[in-house]
């Protein structure tokens, strides 16, 4: 895949997504210079260190580098690892669930409202356990958190 730096329009898409979950200060101070783009069927945004980015021109075809932070199709969507990276700073669009729901969610199951300790926001949300450890991504409709992808996915699917 071809590797390149982010374009300004792509940075704007990432800022827009980050602002759904974090505050303005985090969005402004985020290290966008640590992000690069892998061009394939769609644009994969990877987070890595500056030293690695400087050495990427030594390689012709790169399959992966650093952590996949998200993907750009029409919009930017944070990946599981992207959410993990920003999780200490998430203040909007999240849910905290009880222990039983945590276990079920990590097995790919959905979460019912009675298992939710705290929720802020609707739609695509970050899901945490009661210790505020990031578990995965869900879709909250006011009654159920539908599991989109969780940390247990790596073990179940061999990702």
From Swiss-Prot:
GO terms for molecular function: RNA binding. Belongs to the UPF0113 family. This is UPF0113 protein MJ1410. It comes from the Archaea. InterPro entries: NIP7_N (IPR040598), PUA_sf (IPR036974), UPF0113_PUA (IPR005155).
């Amino acid at each position: 895949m071809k590797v390149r730096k982010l374009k300004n329009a792509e940075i704007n898409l990432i800022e827009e997504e980050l602002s759904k979950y974090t505050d303005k200060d985090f969005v402004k101070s985020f290290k966008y210079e640590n992000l690069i783009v892998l061009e394939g069927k769609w644009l994969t945004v990877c987070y890595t260190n500056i030293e690695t980015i400087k050495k990427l021109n030594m390689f012709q075809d790169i399959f992966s580098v650093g952590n996949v932070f998200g993907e750009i199709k029409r919009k930017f969507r944070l990946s599981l690892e992207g959410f993990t990276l920003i999780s200490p700073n998430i203040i909007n669009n999240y849910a905290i669930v009880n222990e039983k729901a945590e276990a079920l969610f990590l097995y790919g199951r959905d979460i019912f409202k009675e298992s939710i300790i705290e929720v802020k926001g609707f739609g695509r949300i970050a899901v945490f356990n009661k210790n505020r450890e990031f578990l995965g991504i869900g879709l909250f409709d006011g009654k159920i958190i539908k599991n989109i992808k969780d940390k247990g996915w790596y073990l179940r699917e061999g990702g």
